[in-house]
Amino acid sequence: MKNYKYQNTLIGKKQLRQLLAWSFTNYDSMQACALADELKYLGFKYASQAGISISIEDLKIPFVKNLMLEKANQEIINAEKIYLKGKITDVERFQKIIDTWSLTSESLKEQVIYYFKNYDPLNSVYIMAFSGARGNLSQVRQLVGMRGLMSDPSGEIMNLPIKKNFREGLTITDYLMSGYGARKGIVDTALKTANSGYLTRRLIDVGQDVLIREKDCLTNHSFLFSVSNEELKSLNLIYQKILGRVLSKPIHDPKTNRILVPAGTQITPKLIEKFKEYNVKKFYIRSPLTCNLYRAICQNCYGWDLANENLVDIGEAIGILAGQSIGEPGTQLTMRTFHTGGIFTSEARQQITTPINGVIRFYKTLKTVLLRTNRGEDVLITKNSGSVILIPDDEDQDLVQIEILRNTILFPKNNQYIVKDTVIGELLNTNRQIKTEVKPILSDTCGEIFMPVLKKKINLLNNNKLLWILSGQLYNGPINSFVNFYSDYKLNCRSYIFRTKIINHYSGSVEFINTKSNLYQRLIRIKNNKYAFFNSKLEKLRYSIQHKNYLLNLQGDKYLVKIQKKDLRLYLQATRNYQVATLITNRFKTLVGGTVYYDHQNVYKNYKPNSTINYLSRVNFLNNYKPVVSHKTIIWLGEEVYKVNCELNILLAEHGDFISEGFELIPGLFSKTSGVVVIKQKNNLIHTISIKSGLVYEGKKFKMTSKKVYYPGEIIFSHIPITKISFCEHITGKNIEQLLVRPIEIYEFPYLNNISAKIQNTHNKDSNIRLSSKIIYSYKPNQLIKGTRNLNLISTILTLKSKETVTKNLNLELSHNQKTKLIDLKISEKFNLNHYISPNLRYKNLQSCLLIQPNQFIDRYTNLGYLESKTSNSLEIVKIKLKIKDSKQILLISNQDCLTVKKEKFIGKKLNDFIINSSNVNETGKIIIENENNLTLQKGKPYFFPNCKDDNVINKTNLQYKTISPTRVSPRLEKNINYKISLNYYDMMKLSVNKDCTLSEKNEDPIKIKSEFSKLFLKKNGKLYSSLIPQFFKKFSLHTSEFSPKYKQIIQPNGLAKRTIGKMDRTLLMQSSEITKNDYKNLKNSNYQLALLKFVEYPFTKSTKSIGLYSITEDYFEQDVNSVFCKNSEFIEEGETLGLLNLEKEITGDIVQGLPRIEEILEARKKNSNIKRIPTSQKKGLLVQKSSLDTNFEFRKLGTNIKENEKVNPHKLLKVYFNYYGWIKPFICDQKEEIKYARLIKNYEGSYKSFKKVQSFILDSVQAVYQSQGVIINDKHLEVIIKQMTTKVLITYEGNTPLLRREVIDLYHIQYINQIIQSQGKQSACYVPLLLGITKAALNNPSFISAASFQETTRVLTKAAIEGRIDWLRGLKENIIIGHLIPAGTGSQNYRNCFKKESLVRSKLPKSFDTILTR
């Protein structure tokens, strides 16, 4: 064994692995296998000789366990107390408990290890777990530590841990909880196997046609691996990554600059030793991502074949290798974590502890931000790295300086004294997975809400709110209820607290319909009065006319009525406006449709002719309106209208023909009247035929006569006498003008018959309900009624009139009275309790009682019963509070809600103070009565809401704006036109006038402009705002002219009215802010809350940004805001929502997150998880668009997340980078006043570079998931797959190419097409890069056979057939399906020698072959 260093150390699993790897590299696989066999026998031999066994005695429990549990319990009790005092929220308490337990569990594990290491190093459990033979730490922890926190079926962590371990045995509760986790483990294993199999299938389908096809693709691109000075640890990682790759640029000695290694060398372990020696830190490497080949990779870009550590062979199916390598660990990942059965593990935090006692001081340069952690502590977070100093107690000791990194949580305040070994800081864990939920906080008791005013910190938009609920009993009653007592009053059991009378409207006798015990469902009918109809008959019609089914004959007048049969009784149905019956009459019937005219002004004749109507008393004016119908004339012009759809040639009459009555217009359609035919056409079809009756005269001079009315006896044109009132109308016929004389029919509006003569009220005289008749117009004036049916112009109806409002519960019953030959009309009213209760009390606990009996006759306004609320037990009342909003709310504070405490316990407390007793938590509340030695407390419970939006602050200080974007008017951009820009800035009451400045735009390319504007900065409350102002506006000036606030007119600038074309203005409304001067703002209850900012822009018509105010200093550390829904001194019921708290939950980091996460990255899912109802902050998932400094002067790089530790959407990343590379930006010169446009790089390079960024992002994301699980996958495999995901682009503009918009095509393909098109001098196509997930990429395979055998077979085949695609059978899958030899490995096609000349082949062969060939 040459060059093997003798190892005199413990050889565990890791060292064994290294040993075998060494032998594999230096010798070959056969030798390595032999060595492994030898090692196996060695192990068995010594294991059997040592006689290692495991018994229950080997499981030793550390003796500190009980102490630790006690300590943890104490911490939890403290957390409960703090919660009850209102210092932390419910959510934070939960978090505190979980943190306490997970910390206890971790430290117990440390204890176990410590114990084994120091006292019992040969313990068989210890040997087993730590040699890597079987089992791991978490399992040993469960055997001898504590089982720890479990997650419930939905994956949430339960806040009660299992404190026992398996050595001690579990209690019943523990066993059940443990069962949750175990079941989860079993189910997950099954699911994960399936998932991981499917992942492998998709991966192989994507990569199946990627082979090694060439020796070298001659690419100029390379991957750069470099190491900065700080990260020397990661140097070994990088050496691992570059092992077996090929260098693309030569490596120079950093000191002498001579070439150490030429380009194109394979990196071997020996070379890596050389790099370490010369301290090389930059490597330019070839990688599958840089390979130029299309759907293939060359030998040099791929590097070693990992199975034999040599350069890969040509024809190797590396795509399939890659798919298998990525998918296979998936199954392992699943199995790996679940031996423990769903245990919650949290990574140990990196903490900073103090070495000595002393006072802590922060450096001035250390910038910190206040943050409330999810455990409810206010801590400082460092925004930059710096240091703190400890000043020790002893003067002999030196000062201790502790370096602090960025994003460290610091627990102590400045100048705080600290004992040795205290945790003063811990690093924020940025890569943990967190989901934010919203938890509603419900009230435990009913009572009143009190919000004490907390001290405000200046300039904070979010502040903390404390909410007290002081207990009391809440009763809701109607507003007009009567309250039964005064304060300090004793109430007996079942006495009422308030009571409201229920009073009836109509007199009548009582009848119960159903006798339900629940009063709200009980129906009571009160029979009211009767009417009798004399000489009348009721007959049923065979079929209903106008939905009416009975005929009521009332002394010769026939009425149509609608009647419903129910329980053999006839009930009269009334319509919405209480119309009961309609009179049948033919006097106002017309033959056909037409136009009706009457003077509708005349209908309302209430006010005096000369009275002036006062504008302000408009309301009364409406109330005085009572429609009084004056009796007058209706004028009717008949006109027959047919709606038809037919061709012209079917028509039997032409436009302008005069026809007789009964003429056939189209086959089967006859006219009812004679007259002139008018035809309207639509799309060459006949739409309507109308026939206007009358006489027709042809001729020329009608101007004088048209549109006039003539009376009988007059003569037109000195020879045409008129016999009936007529209206002359001028129509255009076929070819000549015609005058149509249309007869006018006149109907007189009738007077009413009094109906009360025919009806006798038999029951009681002062009846509330009357029947009366009424005449109404059926149609509005000047309305053309199309049609040929008979119309009733006027209808006479019977209506039911009631003095009271409640008419929806009326029943009208008709019955024949046999003796008197009359028809009786009985009116009864249903009485339902629900109609008396206002809706907001509907579901509150109101009780009720009735005071009436069946068949009792009651008068009007009798008390029917009470709505009331009773007490369930006797009370002694201490205080009452009343509040009247939409209902009367009564809060009783009785003895049960109060506590009496001795005064000497709480010294210095006065009336209305709040008390929290730290020893006895029950003594918490507000003092409401005090005397010599006792205090009476009203019990209460505080609720704490941190980081609420402060409602008061926002209106006063924060600048709010709203941009209103108009419809965009874009004028034609012609060259060298002087555009005018004017910026008008006017408040509600003032106006700014400004200089106009002209600008000529010199721009050669007809390119769509996206202009950038210079910014106007506004500073307010320490926040900066920018407002976009058009360029060249450094010259503008604002003139403001102020008016007195009482001057109400808004003056509009005159200039604006004239220049309307091409103007695009945006209006900006700001809530009154200090920036705009607004005199109205200070007036009380002024309506002018909004100031107006108006920008008018001229040349920048395509500007995509709306001009407005933008906040520059976005607070990146802003937390999600919590909301509180109740207001001070409200009364609240039990179980109402007080507010919402946001809580962050850490998700257990096992492969439950792993596989789906890998799938999500490889499928390039667009994550839109915004649920609408959760008020999340808008900054979720935003990426930085420009590299810039933020408020804390931190550099934020392009394409990084604004909020830290968040998943990036790869599609957005691609877009951000492509915009950055490919966007056309204007460059504006102020002196010459001209604009030029340029972009960073061309379309192809922009796409290529942004793809490279996304590729490295996806690679890192997937590797991060696998590495967190301890699975090592070589980057090559992932790179092969990622290369397949990032080849396509989406065409956005086709140019002169034969492509279509939104077509998806390969990047190299479109580049080739564009080169050809440009060489011919034509317009090339534009495109944007497109990222496809693995499923999409597999379906977009150029071979349709491969795609169809993967998914969506019919769709793929149909599409291929329509497009007429050809499958060239390049990949493996197509060939297998067709039945050919697969083109990989030995079957890979070797076309090298096919095209060479014969003579060349012959010259290379040896002579002896030659002779064979010639024979």
Swiss-Prot record:
Q: Which GO terms describe its molecular function?
A: DNA binding; DNA-directed RNA polymerase activity; zinc ion binding
Q: Which domain of life is it from?
A: Eukaryota
**Binding of Zn(2+), residues:** 217, 291, 298, 301
Which residue ranges run through the membrane?
none
What detail does the entry give on cofactor binding? Binds 1 Zn(2+) ion per subunit.
Q: What cofactor does this one take?
A: Zn(2+)
Q: What is this protein called?
A: DNA-directed RNA polymerase subunit beta''
The organism is Phaeodactylum tricornutum (strain CCAP 1055/1)
Which lineage is the organism of this entry classified under, starting from the top rank? Answer: Eukaryota, Sar, Stramenopiles, Ochrophyta, Bacillariophyta
Q: Which gene encodes it?
A: rpoC2
